[in-house]
From Swiss-Prot:
Residues in CN hydrolase domain copies: 13-260
Residue ranges crossing the lipid bilayer per the database entry: none
Gene that encodes it: amiE
Keyword Membrane: no
InterPro entries according to UniProt: Aliph_Amidase/BUP, Aliphatic_amidase, C-N_Hydrolase, C-N_Hydrolase_sf
Xref: NCBIfam families: PRK13286.1
Gene3D superfamilies assigned: Carbon-nitrogen hydrolase
Protein's name according to its UniProt entry: Aliphatic amidase
Pfam family, one: CN_hydrolase
EC number: 3.5.1.4
Superkingdom in the source lineage: Bacteria
Organism expressing this protein natively: Rhodococcus erythropolis (strain PR4 / NBRC 100887)
Amino acid sequence: MRHGDISSSNDTVGVAVVNYKMPRLHDRAGVLENARKIADMMIGMKTGLPGMDLVVFPEYSTQGIMYNEEEMYATAATIPGDETAIFSAACREADTWGIFSITGEQHEDHPNKPPYNTLILIDNKGEIVQKYRKILPWCPIEGWYPGDTTYVSEGPKGLKISLIICDDGNYPEIWRDCAMKGAELIVRCQGYMYPAKDQQVMMSKAMAWANNCYVAVANAAGFDGVYSYFGHSAIIGFDGRTLGETGEEEYGIQYAQLSVSAIRDARENDQSQNHIFKLLHRGYSGVHAAGDGDKGVADCPFEFYKLWVTDAQKAQERVEAITRDTVGVADCRVGNLPVEKTIEV
């Protein structure tokens, strides 16, 4: 893991993250113009960072937040589509992989159901190699239709990459899912605003440490007339230490080199802090000393997760018993979310 140079090598993946200014757009013409602006920025960045293998743009950077529902549906894109064609051409020209936001992607039942909040990973040949739909939209504000799974794809120089989006990153389960699928770099694209800056910076660092993985965060910056976005895009080592972090500046960039061999060596040879190994080999020192084998205990000790898998409805009821049983809150209503208990059919 190295920071401060503009290069990369056969063993290091040069990763850049961007504090893209949150755009305020209203139609597809504006979206496509902004997509071309992102493409031009990517190509320019390659001149300044010749070692750049991967560039990451934030959530909402392509379309902005459509606060008008009609505009949200009217600007929802297809994948592949006009937006991705612009990004693919830029990846080919810059000979660089890119991660881009599509908010939203048309639902299969468009326009009868809300769009998805989607990220795409495009390789340096212009091919889409991963499409991830946000599993945990930022309720109660975001009205995206939720996705249902994470992915791992082989990225530049063989580094294994997973994508997550913004509020996803507040749930340790999604990081663990990516790591246990083999992700070595988890990319968190976000359009996060104040007041939650300190919490979000802390969360990404903690999850890098807890999952023995690299983390790249690209966040929006600026003010779009509604929210103030705090930037602080960052690249974090698999030991939880920040390699490089922007401030709040619009279009700020950070860059670091992520060693492929270093993370694989750490996962194979680290012991006391090898969290993903130890989770499935619980107490192996004591188990071995007892003569009960040399693999520790693999069984899941967490009753809630067992319940969630075997009876999701009962798990939901348990959560409601310690929180609330309606999605809306009577003292602070958001939209038309119900604040009185309804019967599910």
